Amino acid sequence: MRVLVCGGRDFDDAGLMISVLDRLHTEKCFTVLIHGNARGADGIADAWASCRSIPREPYEVPQGEWDEIGKKAGPLRNQRMLDEGRPDLVVAFPGGGGTKDVVRRAVKAGVSVHEVNRADDW
């Protein structure tokens, strides 16, 4: 199963992410982990997948794109992750507007979304 992991740049609860991803991976058998290659949740997810030998597909916004179109670059990257990455599942950790944008786009595209709340019992 192809999974896209997203969450805030300030997300730092590695323990929560490890618990959630380990459980979901056991249930669903992730074959690829897609992420936006930003600090925070994306970095933790990348390290998690690396430790488990799960191939990673990072979608970084090129600096020139940030310079040229500013904050519009993030939503364009989010759409690329969905269009090119073709995830079967989105796992969304706590975050801000970018995370909400990924979730909204995934729902619109018919991709299953699992939203993680810090209060969830993992």
Regions from the language model: what does each represent?
Residues 1-2:
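Residues that mark the start of a beta-strand
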